[in-house]
Structures are given as structure tokens and as C-alpha cells.
């Protein structure tokens, strides 16, 4: 039976009030893991250790499993404790009518985001920035300026303000509203000081409530040519605050960036099971959120990193499959274990850049060094490496990419527990001139040399 109209966030809200009742524990501990395991077995999914898939039949099975996961499970609303279900026709309608390209930024600083494919020769868009990492108020502008000064960086992804006027931006307080507005205003001023006043940004990152996110659209702040973030919850869940934010974004004609980081070793389970959920999450982004693009980020439950062997496989297979069977535009976000000014951090980011570029990602978003949890431990140098490696990887044969990745990951994967803490932005850069130290330049050159020895040609 055909659908009455295309599904949107208002339909989601209505169904979230009347859907099947379910406890969150049943959803997290029973429905998600059992269905993911069932679908892995049904379709015989086995990635055989590949980072980027070469078996198109297996990719098709993965797509069917992800589609079926979304169709049969639906999405859990954490506020009403009900399940929102979609029809098969509604899902296909969303897939068949995705936003196939869009522009981020304005003027000469604008960039066109267009579909890429597995092994594409075109370099992906580099969205450089702290990626939600906490940044001190006194260095908020220079930190973001360090990214805008990098020509490899096309757009900025915001950091989190730890304070505004010296006060904590507590959710649903006036300070959260002020921080949400100030965050992007400061970043756009930083871009202008770098000579790139039209750069697009992605945020807001500081605010945690709907009122904070909505207030970021303001004079001097977020505009419709910026990526506006809304986050799904782990796994296949959402709250009604997010649905209200989506309604605002749609009504404002904003570029919508739907974000979610599936957890390897979490509710979904292993590599193939988590990838099934990841594919379902991509599809849900364009259905529930009317997303312009989906920001992925498979993360390891133990190490808190997106750069492990397992999470890179999940990211590579999910993106390649989405790219092969849909026109959904996809990005990935970067959370290395190691901190800035360390070779390990740069090698971790490089492994993910290689994976994302080869698997067809449209946007690379990072780098949140030191797992994105330590204040001021993120700089523009990590984004430079992300961009240079993407440029070197574009067009390389997938078989060669898989060999390089296997060797590269083996260089750092035994060091997660003892990953070097690295240095803060203030220790990595001259804050006044916003230039990296000689020490960081030498570390960077050392990491680059190792990548060249593995076969990358810069």
C-alpha cells in the first residue's frame, strides 16, 4: 500500500505518542542486539578482515540487512518510551529523494558537496575543527583560526566553549543561549581574520538543549549555508528535543547534518552487527531528520577511538555500501587516542582519512585529538594531515588501500592503553601568530615519512 505523504519530523512526533510501548532496557539489551545478530546470520555477513569491501554481493547483503533493521525495529523515542515504525514505501521514498548536492559557505570560500564513490579520484571535503572537543574561552578564536589558515581545510567544525563570560553554559540557562550564539560568532570572526570570511561551519556544539541549538541561528551566527547538527542516540534512538530542532532547521531551510556514532562492542555487538546498525542509522538520517548529510563515527567501546581496526572496518563497509546503493551523502568524524604533537595521533588520523577517502565519504570531519575529551588538545595540524592524506589516497586501488591500512594500523594498535597524551594548543602553537612550533613541524614530517614508506605518494 502506498504512503499518504512523504514522512517528516511532524509524523515522527505524532507516531512517538501512539507507537508500541517498550522499556529502554528491552530496546537496548534485547531488541537491538538480537535483531542485529539475526540479520548477520540471515545474510551470512562476514567482512573477512577487509577495511574497504571488494565483494559487491556482500555489500548488497549488508544494505538489505541495514534496511531490514530499520524497517523491523523502527526508532525508539526515549521521552515517550514508544517505538516509531516506518513503512517500506516511506523508507524508499526518503532514499530516492535525498539531497544529492549542496553548498557550504558563501562567496569564494563556498564549497560544493557532491556524491563520491568507492575509489573516487576526487578529494573529499575536509571539515576541520575541534569536532566537539572542549576549548577554553581565551583561546577559542585562535584554535579555530588554526584550521581556517590551512588550505587543505574547506569548512570548520566547531569546538565546545567551556565557558562564556567566565560562566558555565549550563543547559536551558541564559548562558547556554549566549554560548550557542557566541560560539559561531567567534569562529566566523576567526575565519575572517584568516582571510576566509565565507567559510561554512558545522554546529552548534556547545548547546545541549533544543533552545540552545535553535538560538544559534542568529545575526553573525549560524546561517542556512552552514551545517546544522542534530544527533541520533545509541542505537536507533532519539528524543523529542531533537525532533523539535529538526522542525526548526527545516522551517529555516538550513543544511541539516544528522550525527550519530555507533558503538562497537556496545548494544549492537560485533563488527558486522554494528555495521548493520550503522547502515540503518544512515537511512534514518534522511527519513527522520530530512538530513542533507549524515555524520558517522563508529567508536570503540573500550578505547573511545574511531581509529581502531574494528571501527575502521565498520566505517569502511558502511560508507561503501551506502555509496554503492544510495545517493545519501556521508561524512565521518575523527577521535584518535593520542594527543596533538605526537606521531601516533597523526598516524591514527591518517588511517581514518585513508579509509574514508577510499570508501567514498563526501566529508571528513576532525580531528578531535585525545579522544575529544581533554580541553584545548586539538589543532589545525591534525586537520592538515587529514587533508593531505585524503588527497594522496583519492584514486588509489582498493586492494592497495587495504594493504596500506593493515600495515598502518599495526604501527599503533598495540599502544592504545599507553597512548601519548600530547600537548595543548598553547604548547603546540604560538598563540599570537597562530603558527605551529618547530617541534610539531618535526613530528609532522616524521609521521609523513612513515606514510610515504607505506606507499602513500604526497
UniProtKB/Swiss-Prot annotation:
Keyword Transferase appears in the UniProt entry: yes
Entry keywords, A to Z: Methanogenesis, Methyltransferase, Pyrrolysine, Transferase
GO biological process terms, semicolon-separated: methanogenesis; methylation
Enzyme class of the recorded protein, top EC level: transferase
MF terms (GO), sorted A to Z: monomethylamine methyltransferase activity
Pathway info: One-carbon metabolism; methanogenesis from methylamine
Reaction catalysed by this enzyme: Co(I)-[methylamine-specific corrinoid protein] + methylamine + H(+) = methyl-Co(III)-[methylamine-specific corrinoid protein] + NH4(+)
EC number(s) stated in the UniProt entry for this protein: 2.1.1.248
Other comment: MtmB1 transcript is abundant relative to the mtmB2 transcript.
Record-stated family: Belongs to the monomethylamine methyltransferase family.
Summary of subunit composition and partner proteins: Dimer of homotrimers. Can form a complex with MtmC (MtmC1 or MtmC2).
Function summary: Catalyzes the transfer of the methyl group from monomethylamine to the corrinoid cofactor of MtmC (MtmC1 or MtmC2).
The protein's name: Monomethylamine methyltransferase MtmB1
Source organism: Methanosarcina barkeri
Amino acid at each position: 500500500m502506498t504512503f499518504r505523504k512523504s514522512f517528516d519530523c511532524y509524523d515522527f512526533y505524532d507516531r512517538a505518542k501512539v507507537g508500541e510501548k517498550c522499556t529502554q532496557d528491552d530496546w537496548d539489551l534485547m531488541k537491538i542486539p538480537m535483531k542485529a545478530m539475526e540479520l548477520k546470520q540471515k545474510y551470512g555477513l562476514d567482512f573477512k578482515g577487509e577495511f574497504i569491501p571488494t565483494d559487491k554481493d556482500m555489500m548488497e547483503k549488508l544494505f538489505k540487512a541495514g534496511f531490514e533493521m530499520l524497517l523491523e525495529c523502527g526508532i525508539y523515542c526515549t521521552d515517550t518510551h514508544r517505538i516509531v515504525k516506518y513503512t517500506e514505501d516511506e523508507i524508499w521514498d526518503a532514499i530516492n529523494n535525498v539531497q544529492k548536492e549542496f553548498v557550504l559557505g558563501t562567496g569564494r570560500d563556498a564549497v560544493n558537496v557532491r556524491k563520491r564513490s568507492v575509489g573516487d579520484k576526487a578529494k573529499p571535503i575536509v571539515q576541520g575543527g575541534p569536532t566537539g572537543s572542549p576549548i577554553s574561552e581565551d583561546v577559542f578564536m585562535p584554535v579555530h583560526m588554526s584550521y581556517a589558515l590551512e588550505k587543505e581545510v574547506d569548512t570548520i567544525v566547531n569546538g565546545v566553549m567551556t565557558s562564556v563570560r567566565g560562566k558555565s553554559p549550563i543547559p536551558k540557562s541564559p548562558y547556554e543561549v549566549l554560548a550557542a550564539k557566541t560560539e559561531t560568532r567567534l569562529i566566523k570572526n576567526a575565519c575572517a581574520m584568516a582571510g576566509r570570511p565565507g567559510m561554512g561551519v558545522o554546529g552548534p556544539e556547545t548547546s545541549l538543549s533544543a533552545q540552545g541549538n535553535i538560538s544559534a541561528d542568529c545575526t553573525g551566527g549560524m546561517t542556512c549555508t552552514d551545517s546544522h547538527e542534530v544527533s541520533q542516540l545509541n542505537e536507533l534512538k532519539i528524543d523529542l528535543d531533537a525532533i523539535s530542532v529538526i522542525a526548526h532547521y527545516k522551517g529555516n531551510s538550513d543544511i541539516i547534518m544528522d550525527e550519530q556514532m555507533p558503538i562497537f562492542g556496545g548494544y549492537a555487538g560485533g563488527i558486522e552487527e554494528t555495521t548493520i546498525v550503522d547502515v540503518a542509522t544512515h537511512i534514518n538520517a534522511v527519513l527522520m531528520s530530512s538530513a542533507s548529510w549524515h555524520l558517522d563515527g563508529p567508536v570503540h567501546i573500550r578505547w573511545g577511538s574511531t581509529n581502531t581496526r574494528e571501527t575502521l572496518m565498520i566505517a569502511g563497509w558502511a560508507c561503501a555500501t551506502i555509496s554503492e546503493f544510495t545517493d545519501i551523502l556521508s561524512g565521518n568524524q575523527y577521535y584518535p587516542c593520542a594527543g596533538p604533537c605526537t606521531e601516533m595521533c597523526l598516524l591514527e588520523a591518517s588511517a581514518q582519512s585513508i579509509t574514508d577517502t577510499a570508501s567514498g565519504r563526501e566529508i571528513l570531519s576532525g580531528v578531535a585529538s585525545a579522544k575529544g575529551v581533554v580541553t584545548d588538545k586539538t589543532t589545525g595540524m591534525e586537520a592538515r594531515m587529514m587533508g593531505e592524506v585524503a588527497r594522496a589516497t583519492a584514486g588509489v586501488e582498493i586492494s592497495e588501500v587495504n594493504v596500506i591500512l593493515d600495515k598502518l594500523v599495526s604501527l599503533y594498535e598495540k599502544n592504545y592503553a599507553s597512548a601519548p597524551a600530547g600537548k595543548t594548543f598553547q604548547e603546540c602553537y604560538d598563540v599570537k601568530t597562530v603558527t605551529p612550533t618547530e617541534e610539531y613541524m618535526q613530528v609532522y614530517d616524521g609521521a609523513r615519512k612513515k606514510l610515504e614508506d607505506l606507499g602513500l605518494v604526497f
